[in-house]
């Protein structure tokens, strides 16, 4: 069975060593595995949320495209495209926006962080917040759901957005699927072994901290940057502490286990920091020199990059265009020539009811959700060690087993046989919480024939 994997990088800056080791290199390696259908894209619509400098965005698109290819991505074996070359994505974003609950988007980490910062500074909670920032998770959901990605490699700060994509896709399926699921429900993939590299000052390597080492800068500039890596004051001949040395962490991310063990031993034996920095430069230059040359060749031939990306977009649209047509049909955006006429003769839709949805969580445990008739989540179960246990509780609730709803602040818990088995969402006020409890009681009430 083929697994579809999707990865995007926002085009707001020049790729650095941290981007390469943390995202680009592992993604390229994953694309070379058997049984994988990989989609890689330049998230240039997302870039507009954070950056209003057109020249910077244009330059970053070029640099990131060249970086993927110079790093070893084979465009003939993957689908490689620019987000902005797929017009179906913004259209799908709107379809999903129309079913995405505002309360769900209110809980997005990036939006909440902006609101919290504004409140802390005594400003209006939404000061400086654009609709782009607020609805960013819906655009990300469209990126994922457009191609029915099964797995989405992300950093821990992005797990919530993949979960939101699941929720939005699930709600669309419920409202318009009529027994069919249009969208596969994606899973976030966290690579525990992926490196998070320190920058020149020891903090996480980030453009925000101005502490990066550009990936394909010249050998001279790379050597100069490495010379500025902060180290302790231990002199040559004094034993160094590799586990607390940022320079060693960088070396470890690019070396073989044998090279790393040898470098560790040299530091313990008193290798001077100047010599250690020279070792790091030699390691990086040896790995990146050929890729650097290819990168600069690509940068010098932007028309070739354009052709590669347009070919990837054409490949992606062979999937996106017919799929969006199905979605348009599902929501009622149909041709008047269609044999199915939206007239009074069409039978009234069958009344939708609440439903239980089982799934397996990232940690391998089993859980279930209870969705209301409109697709809103009413309950999220606690974790169960196996599917049988989760299914038994779900079945007992569906059969009208005596459940006890207990209010917990602006949320509530569901108890069964003296044990808490599920939790409700966190609500903005008591009225919304009480309305949800009413819907829950109706959903769990035994059905009369």
UniProtKB/Swiss-Prot annotation:
* Alphabetically ordered keywords of this record: Aminoacyl-tRNA synthetase, ATP-binding, Cytoplasm, Ligase, Nucleotide-binding, Protein biosynthesis
Q: Where is this motif: 'HIGH' region?
A: 11-19
| Matches recorded under InterPro entries | aa-tRNA-synth_Ic, Rossmann-like_a/b/a_fold, Trp-tRNA-ligase, Trp-tRNA-ligase_bac-type, Trp-tRNA_synthetase, YegP-like_sf
Example of a GO biological process term: tryptophanyl-tRNA aminoacylation
One GO molecular-function entry: ATP binding
Q: Which positions bind ATP?
A: 10-12, 18-19, 155-157, 197, 204-208
Question: Main site of residence?
Answer: cytoplasm
Q: Can you tell me which residues bind L-tryptophan? A: 143
Cellular component terms, GO, for this chain's entry?
A: cytosol
Q: Which family, according to UniProt?
A: Belongs to the class-I aminoacyl-tRNA synthetase family.
Assembly behavior: Homodimer.
Could you tell me what this protein does?
A: Catalyzes the attachment of tryptophan to tRNA(Trp).
Designated name of the protein: Tryptophan--tRNA ligase
Native organism is Pseudomonas putida (strain ATCC 47054 / DSM 6125 / CFBP 8728 / NCIMB 11950 / KT2440)
């Amino acid at each position: 069975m083929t697994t579809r994997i999707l990865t995007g990088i926002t085009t707001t800056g020049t790729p650095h060593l941290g981007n390469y080791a943390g995202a680009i290199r592992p993604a390229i390696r994953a694309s070379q595995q058997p049984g994988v259908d990989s989609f890689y894209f330049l998230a240039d619509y997302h870039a507009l949320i954070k950056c209003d400098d057109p020249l910077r965005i244009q330059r970053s698109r070029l640099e990131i495209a060249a970086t993927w290819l110079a790093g070893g991505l084979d465009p003939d074996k993957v689908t490689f495209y620019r987000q902005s070359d797929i017009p179906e994505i913004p259209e799908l974003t709107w379809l999903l926006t129309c079913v995405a609950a505002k309360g769900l988007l209110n809980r997005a980490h990036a939006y909440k962080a902006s609101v919290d910062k504004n409140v802390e500074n005594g400003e209006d909670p939404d000061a400086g917040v654009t609709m782009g920032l607020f609805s960013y998770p819906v655009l990300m959901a469209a990126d994922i759901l457009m191609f029915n990605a099964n797995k989405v490699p992300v950093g821990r700060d992005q797990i919530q957005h993949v979960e939101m994509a699941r929720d939005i896709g699930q709600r669309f399926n419920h409202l318009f699927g009529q027994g069919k699921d249009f969208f596969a429900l994606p899973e976030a993939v966290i690579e525990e072994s992926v490196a998070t590299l320190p920058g020149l000052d020891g903090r996480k390597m980030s453009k925000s901290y101005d502490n990066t080492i550009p990936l394909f800068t010249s050998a001279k500039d790379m050597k100069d940057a490495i010379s500025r890596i902060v180290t302790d004051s231990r002199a040559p001949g004094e034993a160094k502490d590799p586990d607390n040395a940022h320079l060693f962490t960088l070396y470890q991310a690019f070396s073989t286990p044998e090279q790393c063990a040898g470098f560790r031993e040299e530091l313990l034996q008193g290798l001077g920091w100047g010599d250690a920095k020279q070792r790091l430069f030699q390691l990086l230059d040896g790995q990146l020199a050929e890729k650097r040359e290819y990168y600069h060749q690509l940068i010098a031939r932007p028309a070739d990059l354009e052709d590669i990306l347009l070919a990837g977009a054409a490949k992606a649209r062979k999937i996106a265009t017919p799929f969006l047509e199905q979605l348009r049909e599902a929501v009622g955006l149909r041709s008047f020539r269609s044999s199915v006429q939206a007239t009074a003769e069409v039978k009234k839709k069958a009344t939708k009811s609440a439903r239980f949805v089982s799934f397996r969580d990232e940690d391998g445990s089993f859980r279930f959700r209870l969705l209301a008739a409109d697709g809103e989540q009413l309950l999220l179960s606690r974790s169960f060690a196996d599917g049988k246990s989760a299914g038994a509780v779900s079945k007992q609730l569906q059969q009208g087993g005596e459940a006890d709803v207990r209010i917990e602040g602006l949320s509530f818990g569901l108890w069964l046989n003296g044990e808490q088995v599920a939790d409700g969402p966190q609500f903005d006020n008591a009225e919304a919480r009480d309305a949800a409890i009413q819907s829950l009681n109706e959903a769990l009430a035994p059905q009369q024939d």
